[in-house]
Swiss-Prot record:
TM helices/strands, residue ranges: none
Subcellular location: Cytoplasm
Gene: rlmN
Catalytic center residues: E86 (proton acceptor), C343 (s-methylcysteine intermediate)
Name the UniProt record assigns to this protein: Dual-specificity RNA methyltransferase RlmN
S-S bonds: C112-C343
SUPFAM superfamilies: Radical SAM enzymes
Stated family: Belongs to the radical SAM superfamily. RlmN family.
Cross-referenced PANTHER family: 23S RRNA METHYLTRANSFERASE, RADICAL SAM CORE DOMAIN-CONTAINING PROTEIN
GO CC annotation, single: cytoplasm
Molecular-function GO term, any one: rRNA (adenine(2503)-C2-)-methyltransferase activity
Region (Disordered): 351-381
Organism: Campylobacter concisus (strain 13826)
Function text: Specifically methylates position 2 of adenine 2503 in 23S rRNA and position 2 of adenine 37 in tRNAs. m2A2503 modification seems to play a crucial role in the proofreading step occurring at the peptidyl transferase center and thus would serve to optimize ribosomal fidelity.
Other remarks in the entry: Reaction proceeds by a ping-pong mechanism involving intermediate methylation of a conserved cysteine residue.
Amino acid sequence: MKNLLDLSIEELKELVSPSFRATQIYEWVYKKNATEFSQMLNLPKDMRQDLAEKFYLDPLKCVKFEQSSDGSIKYLFELKDGLKIESVLLPMKEEISDEDGKISRHARYTICVSSQVGCKMGCAFCLTAKGGLVRNLTAGEIVGQILWIKRENKIPYERRINVVYMGMGEPLDNLTNVSKAIKILALNEGLAISPRRQTVSTSGLGSQIKKLGEMDLGVLLAISLHAVTNELRSRLMPINKAYNIEAVMDAVRGFPIDMRKRVMFEYLVIKDLNDSVSDAKKLVKLLHGIKAKVNLIYFNPHEGSEFGRPELASMLKFQEYLRDHGVTCTIRQSKGLDISAACGQLKQRNENPKFRANVSGNSAAKTEEKPTNDKTNVSKK
């Protein structure tokens, strides 16, 4: 059997007749939360039976989740072959003014998805990298993470969703399937998540950044930089030996970006390693001529890590220097500090009960095993 979520609507149209049935199937799956073909009552019975014999709609199963006191939820999913991946739901808030200028608050969500089982980039600060790469996810397995999280949390179809490819794996090391997932998510017949609300994060595969740009998908780009010298970056991120900082910056300068948007540079701040004002000065020079936004990220400690979480004062000084020199800079609001927030932590805890994430305030967090026979709500829309 094949995963129907792997199919674009054009591919599905080639498999069903008449072709308008493909649109109906897409609407059931992406807009009405159907998880079984038997729920698609406007399809002929024989077609439903035929589809059920050839395809499945549930590429993953949630085996555990942890909910933080800040509302973020980390999920551990099991794939059909028994391998496990992680995804995260980050509830946000945005302010919207009505016609009278009165501000009302509306929830919005960011979903962080994995693109691979494991990762071969070998970043020193990343728990996922310690296990190496097992395999790429298919487009349907990537899309399935978003579908499951939206369905489980009863997020309305119309509600704004941002997708970030920042979970387990290097997205550009699985560019074929990631680019297909981007296109499937953007289809109006499906979830209609615009590419401009999808961000691909990379450790800096220069040649793949170029390929992604040539695809002209309209997605946003985020670069995991984390250091301002090649010596330190090579220590933290072995990929720097193949694509050094200069090569990454050259690739970024050639990447097509919406004039209203900026390239995001993610900078993981590690105590006494890359958190000085001197580092900030070097970063300003590196970003010269690039329409950039820097996102400072607190290092999330985990058991066995040699690195420490930076002080708030260091973060603020770093941010202040960048802003004073014309670089847009934010400090990422730390979410999930009371759960296994760092990439790979929940998977590691599930597989190794002796492992403990170095987190605080665990009494506020909620951890649950998910039953395997969850009933899924199907929208009546």
